[in-house]
């Protein structure tokens, strides 16, 4: 490996420490009292314990005791402002119809529809560390992955491999496999999968770089997750990108579990392309519109040979990728918008964009640096309580498989249970008003989100979790 592996490795983040009184309700409440981010919780609808188990549609019982919602890594909670934004959109549509495409209404929180995707891109850019022109809000994650692989995966008989992780999220795996097949190659030969060492769940940066060294001469693309969905491991995006590019490789990232969760600097890290969803940490709603990053060097449009012969990177074209100045000329001469917007295909859903703009308005009141500082302390507190609340247990009923190093994780902790405990424990947690995500065969993913979760949530969760574990052990 080259020297870049040592030079670019980030320094470790210092893990917070907690006093001997950490495992008390009073201590958790004192942390909340000093939390400068606590004001954001009131901007979300926290489901009540009663409603979380409802079997019919009900209005949120705001007067009831709140559930403990640790599932923002699967679906973020609804911001209160979403209803206002959606109503404004519906009122615009009902009152001025098609004119909503081109007319701003003074008393609306939304801009005209044709500019809404551009506005959302400007809101989202700081969250992923990009220029606004490098971000496009469009489609869904896997669709965007296919669109960008059509542009960035250009295999040849000599170089057709894709370096990826061994247990990618199934949709990513299917997309990669189908792209390889579509180009006429064998996925079993072209998919290079990197896994952890035996007995570990972490994939080291060093192993990734060694794999790049081993396969660089036959590889067309490196495509990895920013955060591994099952273990919660945060990959060293900066180092891996720089090293792979030093070997002449294109590097793409699936940031589904990283965007809105951890600080990113996609432009400065020179990432070629990335995709993400917005329904997890960005709280835009189930199946909401997704995001794509294309570095500015790949979005350039060159008119040096004249207006009729623009030069640009190959992509799958659609009318919404055309420059706004000539989009409605209908002359069938494609002139792409410069930047990521030139990779758009179809008119984006205004309903989806409306929900997203509402959710992002909360992010625009803070910064990823502030969010990550609370993540650091909130998740460290969760880890501390889980590991110290039963110190005398010589045969622990669980293992945390997420890296202990806070620089190698976001908010999520993945708790690996003993075999056969998952369903029973999950049912107990749900009955107690806790929402967490279970992943078969034996993992519960716990994600306290800094925008709406509290230290008291963490403390109460651990008490209930430990009691449920005891019952499982006795059964």
Curated annotation (Swiss-Prot):
GO molecular function annotation: kynureninase activity; pyridoxal phosphate binding
Keywords carried by this UniProt record: Cytoplasm, Hydrolase, Pyridine nucleotide biosynthesis, Pyridoxal phosphate
Entry cofactors: pyridoxal 5'-phosphate
Predominant location category: cytoplasm
A Pfam family this chain is assigned to: KYNU_C
Coiled coil ranges: none
GO biological process, one term: L-kynurenine catabolic process
Residues reported to bind pyridoxal 5'-phosphate: 141-142, 169-172, 254, 257, 279, 319, 347
Homology family: Belongs to the kynureninase family.
Protein name: Kynureninase
Organism: Sclerotinia sclerotiorum (strain ATCC 18683 / 1980 / Ss-1) (White mold)
């Amino acid at each position: 490996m080259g020297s870049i592996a040592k030079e670019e490795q980030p320094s470790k983040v210092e893990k917070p420490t907690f006093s001997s009184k950490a495992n008390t309700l009073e201590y958790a409440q004192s942390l909340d009292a000093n939390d400068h981010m606590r004001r954001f919780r009131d901007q979300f609808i926290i489901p009540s314990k009663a409603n979380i188990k409802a079997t019919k549609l009900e209005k949120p019982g705001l007067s009831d005791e709140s559930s403990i919602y640790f599932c923002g890594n699967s679906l973020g909670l609804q911001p209160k402002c979403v209803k206002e934004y959606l109503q404004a959109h519906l009122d615009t549509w009902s009152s001025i119809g098609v004119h909503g495409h081109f007319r701003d209404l003074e008393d609306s929180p939304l801009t005209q529809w044709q500019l809404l995707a551009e506005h959302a891109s400007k809101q989202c850019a700081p969250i992923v560390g990009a220029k606004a022109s490098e971000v496009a809000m469009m489609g869904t994650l896997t669709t965007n992955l296919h669109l960008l692989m059509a542009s960035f995966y250009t295999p040849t008989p000599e170089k057709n491999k894709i370096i990826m992780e061994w247990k990618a999220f199934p949709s990513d795996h299917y997309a990669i496999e189908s792209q390889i097949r579509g180009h006429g190659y064998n996925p079993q030969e072209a998919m290079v999968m990197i896994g952890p060492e035996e007995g570990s769940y972490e994939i080291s940066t060093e192993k990734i770089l060694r794999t790049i060294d081993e396969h660089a001469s036959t590889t067309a693309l490196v495509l990895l997750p920013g955060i591994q969905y099952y273990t919660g491991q945060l990959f060293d995006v900066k180092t891996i990108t720089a090293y792979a590019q030093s070997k002449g490789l294109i590097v793409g990232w699936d940031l589904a579990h990283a965007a809105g969760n951890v600080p990113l600097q996609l432009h400065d890290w020179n990432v070629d392309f990335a995709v993400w969803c917005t329904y997890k940490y960005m709280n835009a709603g189930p199946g909401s519109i997704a995001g794509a990053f294309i570095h500015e060097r790949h979005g350039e449009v060159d008119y040096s040979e004249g207006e009729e012969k623009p030069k640009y990177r190959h992509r799958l074209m659609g009318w919404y990728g055309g420059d706004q100045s000539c989009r409605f000329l209908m002359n069938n001469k494609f002139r792409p918008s410069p930047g990521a917007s030139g990779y758009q295909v179809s008119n984006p859903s205004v309903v989806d964009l409306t929900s997203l703009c509402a959710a992002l308005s909360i992010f625009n009141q803070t910064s990823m640096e502030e969010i990550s500082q609370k993540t650091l302390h909130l998740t460290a507190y969760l880890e501390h309580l889980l590991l110290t609340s039963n110190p005398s247990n010589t045969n622990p009923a669980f293992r945390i498989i997420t890296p202990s190093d806070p620089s190698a994780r976001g908010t999520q902790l993945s708790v690996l249970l003993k075999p056969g405990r998952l369903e029973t424990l999950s049912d107990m947690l749900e009955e107690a008003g806790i929402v967490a995500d279970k992943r078969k065969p034996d993992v519960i993913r716990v994600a306290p989100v800094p925008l709406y979760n509290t230290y008291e949530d963490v403390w109460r969760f651990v008490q209930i979790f430990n009691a449920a574990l005891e019952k499982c052990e006795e059964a």
